[in-house]
Amino acid sequence: SGTAAAYGEAEVKGFELAVSEINAKGGINGKKVKLESMDDKGDATEASNAYNKLVGDNNVLAVAGPTISATTAAVAPLADQSKLVTIAPAATSDSIETGNYLFRTCFKDSYQGEVAARFAAENLKVKKVAVLYGTGDPYSSGVGEAFAKAAEKLGLEVVDKESSSSADDTEYSAQLQKIQASGAELLYAPYYYSVAGPYIIPQARSVGFDGYVMGPDGYDGLKLTGDKAQYNKTYYTTHYSADDNTNSKVQDFIKSYKSKNNAEP
């Protein structure tokens, strides 16, 4: 649950599918795999508490998660202390220290910030950009700063940088009015889909901003929120699109996931 609930829900469904397929083939070394899911609610304290419970269970051999940067940052030191293999699927913040027991299967914010800036300059051909990010979240602030730094290196003018006190506020009109007045052709707003979709993008349009809106992988999920028409001229970077992958194993996974969950993976 929490700000990025859709990610956790999809991951659990994917894990459940994998476990069922592994066990149907006899398990691992003849032993059945058991999946135990715990909800960190997108909160650092909840994540630490849940992780410590798993550490205390001698039957737990590895942990997949937490998902997002804020919760993974809280768990990172615990992984090495407990020597429990932990894999974070989407913790992109550069501030997270991976060690001997914590790994991630995603790119870092410095990378996606650079890619987004390059796309803005080379594909969208804009000259002036603005950034809006949440100062209280390592993901939002990290990728926001990475984009701004990369944009300046590419010769783009960062005409305005605005911030919110957290990455899950619901009112951004004051900041967006300043961005609209700045002459920005593109707004880079690194928040999660659950904030960008219902709040930031429609509020940007309401104050008269009709330029491009761009975000990071946290925008993956926009189709779950808001009026899809408002996403015209909206772009985001993401790790991977299963739909575009022709590998037979990937397509088999998509088919099995849809069949089991009646939903897109």
Predicted segment positions?
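Extracytoplasmic/secreted envelope proteins and their assembly/folding machinery
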Residues: 12-19, 48-52, 64, 72-80, ...
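Extracytoplasmic "Venus flytrap"
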Residues: 1-16, 38-45, 67-68, 132-142, ...
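General small-molecule cofactor/ligand-binding pocket signal
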Residues: 34-38, 159, 235
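Extracellular/periplasmic periplasmic-binding protein-like sensory domains
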Residues: 201-265
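An alpha-beta-alpha
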Residues: 102-167, 186
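Beta-alpha junction/loop-to-helix N-cap segments that form part of ligand/metal-binding clefts
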Residues: 7-13, 25-95, 164-172, 194-195
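Sec-exported extracytoplasmic/periplasmic mature domains
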Residues: 16, 20-27, 52-60, 76-84, ...
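Periplasmic-binding protein-like
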Residues: 54-67, 87-89, 128-133, 183-194, ...
